[in-house]
């Protein structure tokens, strides 16, 4: 994106948190306070975009429809990455953490394409919000086959997905219903 944009390497040390601990969430790009969520009992060490279990998450923005951004959502795409890295031991677990967080606390970013990988598998997950009137997000995640590679291109890449292949394709329960209600499909 920019030769000067990523001039630092973040570090979140592993920690054990007391029951009832809250985590304050700040928008990754602006630093604006967006809300708080319950902290996980244990969080993992994260340096940059990889954690101690070799889970890594990268992203590329494709924007999407402006009317689907929910400014009231607590979780933005950058916070989503680092919270998921602190809470996940595998790529699949990271997908579950990410989608559960936005479902419960709302998603306040535009369209994002995430690459989520661990030593055993890699996934592409694309996510858009549901707009100001709905909390949550619509998303699809497809496993990258072992004999393939993938690259980010600042645009959505998932054009079709196999609804019946639960081993290699995950998606929000309302992905088709939402698209039909909005007149997109």
Kindly give the residue locations of the regions a language model identified.
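Second-shell loop/turn segments in exported
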Residues: 67-71, 79-88
